[in-house]
Amino acid sequence: MDEFDGFTRPTSSNSSANRNSNNSMNRVENNNSNSDSANTVDSRGDAHTRMRQGFEKSFPSSPNKKRPRTNEGDRFIPSRDASTELWTGFTKVEGPLTPVKKKQSVADRNFTTLLRSELFGSNDETFNNSPIATPNTTIGVSTPRTDSGIDDIELTQRTPPSSSHTSSSILQNTPVTPSRKIFHYLSPRDRNKSSYGKKAQYQDNPNRTIYSLSPVRSITKDLISASRLEGRELPSIPYRVLDAPGLAGDFYLNLLDWGQCNMLAVALASRVYLWSGISSEVTVMHNFYPTDTVTSLRWVQRGTHLAVGTHNGSVEIWDAATCKKTRTMSGHTERVGALSWNDHVLSSGGRDNHILHRDVRAPEHYFRVLTAHRQEVCGLEWNSNENLLASGGNDNALMVWDKFEEKPLYSFHNHIAAVKAITWSPHQRGILASGGGTADRTIKLWNTQRGSMLHNIDTGSQVCNLLWSKQTNEFISTHGFMENEVALWNYPSVSRVGTLKGHTDRVLYLAMSPNGENIVTGAADETLRFWKLFDSKSKHSASTMSSPFDPTMKIR
């Protein structure tokens, strides 16, 4: 019997016949004869003494054949059979990531993306397609560029083609010096002659890195924003639902808006209701019955004044703090379905195909009439930072106007249905998004600085509203036939982040809270649903805001 730390186990009795066959190996095997198997261990101390004496000698190995399976008694010593790979039996089981570990993983991935982009450029394929991994590929190394915009040195590494007279396996693994020059230099005369125009053009380019105020490059910001919210979860249900009986199911109207004063205005039939985002109290501002009905609403950018468009073609200004009308402005001959503010200028679009610019401070309020649209104007949105106005109409046209000019700067006719949904990006200059109706079902993104279309997204349903997030580089779209859903999109990847469901009819109205944290959607199912989508970055205080109706405000 073999003795090991007080435990006994049976061993093979024919080990003495193979002692002279494997003298070169130095493995420890206790192969005693049958005469020694009768000996027993009386105490644990003798077992340790015999084990030390056995290790001081060199024992030959057992014959080279499969060892019989043994049932070892020591539960602390695993069976180390040669045919068993321990890593397959003792692999650590990875459980689901906790929220803390998930955030840490996302942060690590974003930081790695930032370092790659800043140190090695935006082409991630250079990390994988090295010359060693792919010897038959051509690798272009970006050349250092001076302030003059001229490539002083051109460095290109190429692998020469293999010859047909030699073994391809040998040549692919043998470094060969290129037959042409690696470095190219230009004489000062040729350099000045060929690059004078390029130098001036490059130095005047506003997109140069030295003119940027950001600590990172623009491509890095796009990469980080694209991966920041990748795969994040959206709420499955709204955190508040309000009944809205009498909410019109008309695609061409705009009956919902959330002001900077944290008041939500909604028009139900002929009445305008105000819901306080602070106290959740509901107030009836005014009832226009029986003389008129409400067709559009829009809060002033700063303050508590609300513009109301009516079916008769008039536009009224109301002070929501006192629920009193301050003035009435005429001009349209039919209903006013779209309103948009640019400081003290209120622009209105009507069913008479006209757009009116009104200065609310002047007695003679409207000073410009735009007549480029051929059918009803159903979408208006000012970009106050660049003084650009975007308008959409039932003539399937999207137009961009430079300030108060009478002719459009651009006129796009790519949509094949009415263009009501319009929104400007608050994060990039000149980026505009527009959505088409039932026959179109697309969201198109435009670069208004160049007058070109950037993206075309087929949503599969009617696009009723578009709204860009104030906090993140994302935009929200609401849809009618046939999905009746709310979608969140990432920019610039234009990938769908998620979908909000719950409405049972067309989601015709959309507004965002003043802090940019929540949105509210209104549908023809006569409900208002509140969704929390973003994290608030700052607190907005209505008491510190100046209004264009403030008498102490200067007239520009």
Curated annotation (Swiss-Prot):
Region (Disordered): 1-80, 126-173
Domain of life: Eukaryota
Record field: compositional bias (Polar residues): 126-146
BP terms from Gene Ontology: anaphase-promoting complex-dependent catabolic process; mitotic G1 cell size control checkpoint signaling; negative regulation of G1/S transition of mitotic cell cycle; positive regulation of anaphase-promoting complex-dependent catabolic process
Coiled coil: none
Low complexity bias: start-end ranges: 12-37, 159-169
Family: Belongs to the WD repeat CDC20/Fizzy family.
Name of the protein this chain belongs to: WD repeat-containing protein srw1
Organism: Schizosaccharomyces pombe (strain 972 / ATCC 24843)
